[in-house]
Design a protein with these regions (language model features):
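C-terminal accessory helical subdomains adjacent to catalytic cores in phosphodiester-
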Residues: 3-19, 25-44, 51-178
Length: 178
């Protein structure tokens, strides 16, 4: 999702690199080393993780911030947790899902109560598969949907926090004299 979302948020003057991990254990195991090893003094790090089955998003974020602190570069890190899964972001913008999956009528479901506050949906990936008739596929679907997500969508607080944080980092980077 970040692959197709970041170009829509960031200025063309900012180059970025995405590093995918093989699940949350791999992320937690390698994150400190990856951040510490990055030699570019302008590098900033956006760490995005699903909450998955963990009951406490604050504890997950605190743990990741602790790992960032150990790297010595916490001031350059932005940690965001998708409540409960990344699919929550998509359920907050069914028009984007509809465009990505060529399902024009999907947006009409947005006013249903559960889709007005998607961060509260217990199993967003299951809900997304259900509402799309199994047309949504995690990797390909995420990439495609990211192209259409409305950046100012306020239905998902976790999505709004991600976009706001990335924009703040962008502002800080662009203010650094080169």
């Amino acid at each position: 999702m970040l692959e197709s979302l970041l170009p829509r948020i960031l200025s063309n003057d900012i180059q970025y690199r995405l590093i995918a991990f093989e699940g949350k254990q791999d992320l937690e195991k390698q994150l400190e080393r990856r951040i510490r090893g990055y030699q570019n003094s302008l590098a900033r790090f956006v760490i995005l993780r699903d909450l998955d089955s963990h009951p406490d998003c604050r504890a997950v974020k605190k743990n990741l911030l602790g790992i960032c602190r150990l790297s010595g570069k916490i001031q350059f890190c932005l940690v965001r947790i998708a409540c409960t899964e990344l699919e929550t972001f998509y359920l907050a913008d069914l028009a984007a899902v509809g465009m990505a999956l060529q399902m024009s009528r999907l947006a009409s479901h947005q006013n249903n109560r559960k889709f007005r506050s998607p961060d509260a949906i217990g199993n967003p990936s299951k809900e997304l598969k259900l509402i799309t008739g199994n047309r949504y596929q995690k990797v390909a679907g995420s990439r495609e949907i990211g192209k259409y997500l409305q950046l100012d969508n306020a239905r998902s607080a976790s999505f709004r926090n991600l976009v706001t944080g990335v924009r703040r980092m962008e502002t800080e980077l662009l203010a650094i004299p080169v």
